[in-house]
Design a protein with these regions (language model features):
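N-terminal active-site segment of His-dependent metallophosphoesterases
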Residues: 1-68, 75
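Active-site neighborhood of phospho(di)ester-bond hydrolases with catalytic His/Asp-centered motifs
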Residues: 6-7, 43-47, 77-84, 104-109, ...
Length: 450
């Protein structure tokens, strides 16, 4: 069975107030052509179809038009599962209509049983070619309720186990049901998931150069009015909303080793889990933060048979929009902007830039770079200044102004570091930050509401 594995489209995303409709439209057209080109019999979308739970009409129209366009191809199966950015209810709402078109949607596990998560995949002639255990993003409470609503799990377990044990049990249960459905047929069994797995292979190597030196970078909120609303929830601007609880650090042993492939979503970089070629993240086809600007984007073409190692081809997604992140002192930033302008004159492309002042004296980047930014073929969306530069600020007024550089997430990290008496970039601080940042953001949001 040959299929395309993709995830984390985040349709409707407006990173730093950028309208990305044309960019996402170009990707969907390209994806359809790639599906036809590789002869994919199925498409698996592993969560985060949309960027928010209430996506715009434009985003929803793009999604449904794309699904409809696949009816004209030989891709006879589409599997869509919900992610943490999605509304499971919204995804599930048209399931009856989509099901008739062999487009299977599992927005959430609410009001479902184990059997409802098992989907048989068929070719254009109606012959079975595989089975998919379609598991969406699950919050801890949803998983607990899932088993409380069931008389018992397939193996007789109960809902009193830990959340990580319940997740492992659910994957075991759906796999066991898939085995029963397969019978004596020789067809592969795959699964989906939208979660944060531990021990990601390749991710650190891919992004280490990109993120080097960025840990001390903070937001210059005084430069662009209203920008804070568009800043990512994570301190490193990768657009991934943290998963709180035990489901936020899933071990590879959670997935039955007999599964022929596990298609994951949530991480925006193409990665293997624990160096296991059968358990992979496709990554997002789009840049979700300026620190991702230089990372290539992929979809995965997977060819899998029962009991064999899958053949996986990384297909690079062409860029429809260019993102650049430049760092250095003022003169370095000026030169990089001049070079970029020359490149865009020779080869025009819609381009957005993030500037990081990481050395030299504290200056207003608005004033210092006005000549290099005004009337050019690119748009600078953000100015930032590193903490190292801010530490050199001498005057009281500049010190007061420098506090505006920090986001609420930065202050939360500093609070954790103070309580732990650790450096704010230490592993201990990072672990606590990752564990509680979503709860912190939720509390801040509710405080603003009430």
């Amino acid at each position: 069975m040959k299929f395309i594995h993709t995830a984390d489209w985040h349709l409707g995303n407006t990173m730093h107030d950028i309208d990305r409709t044309r960019e996402t439209g170009a990707f969907l057209e390209w994806l359809k052509s790639e599906i036809e080109k590789v002869g994919a019999q199925a498409l698996v979308i592993a969560g985060d179809v949309f960027d928010v739970v209430n996506p715009s009409n434009i985003a929803k129209t793009q999604y449904y038009k794309f699904l409809a366009s696949l009816l004209k191809t030989n891709c006879s199966n589409v599997i869509v599962v919900g992610g943490n950015h999605d509304s499971g209810t919204l995804l599930d709402a048209p399931a009856g209509i989509l099901d008739a078109l062999n487009i299977k949607v599992v927005g959430s596990i609410n009001n479902r049983k184990v059997d409802d998560l098992i989907i048989e995949l068929k070719d254009a002639q109606g012959d079975a070619i595989g089975i998919c255990c379609a598991l969406p993003f699950m919050r801890d409470l949803e998983l607990e309720q899932f088993y409380k609503n069931s008389e018992k799990s397939v193996d007789g377990g109960n809902a009193n186990a830990s959340d990580s044990d319940l997740l492992k049990r659910l994957y075991a249960d759906v796999y066991r049901c898939a085995i029963e459905l397969r019978g004596n047929r020789t067809i592969p069994i795959i699964a989906t998931g939208h979660l944060y797995a531990s021990n990601l292979s390749g991710r650190d190597a891919e992004i280490s150069d990109v993120r080097a030196g960025l840990d001390n970078v903070t937001e210059n909120a005084n430069t662009f009015a209203g920008e804070n609303a568009a800043v990512s929830e994570t301190s490193v601007d990768d657009g991934v909303r943290e998963v709180v609880g035990t489901l936020g650090n899933v071990d590879v042993s959670t997935f039955p080793s007999e599964l022929d492939y596990v298609a994951l979503g949530h991480i925006h970089y193409t990665s293997m889990v624990a160096k296991n070629p059968k358990v992979r993240y496709s990554g997002s086809p789009f840049v979700m933060g300026f620190d991702e600007a230089n990372c290539k984007r992929y979809v995965l073409a997977v060819d899998v048979e029962q009991g064999d190692a899958p053949s996986v081809e990384k297909i690079e997604v062409p860029k429809a929009v260019r993102f650049e992140q430049f760092k250095g002192d003022v003169e370095t930033l000026k030169q990089k902007l001049r070079n970029l302008e020359k490149e865009l004159i020779a080869k025009p492309m819609e381009t957005y830039v993030d500037l990081l002042l990481t050395s030299g004296e504290f200056v207003s980047l608005n004033d210092a770079l006005e000549a290099e930014e005004s009337g050019k073929h690119f748009v600078v969306k953000r100015h930032r200044i590193s903490r190292d530069v801010l530490r050199g600020v001498a005057s009281f007024d500049d010190c007061v102004e420098s506090t505006k550089q920090y986001t609420k997430e930065d202050y939360f990290r500093m609070l954790i570091a103070s309580n732990l008496q650790e450096n704010d970039e230490s592993d201990a601080v990072k672990n606590q930050y990752d564990k509680f940042i979503s709860l912190f953001n939720e509390a801040v949001s509710k405080a603003h509401e009430g």
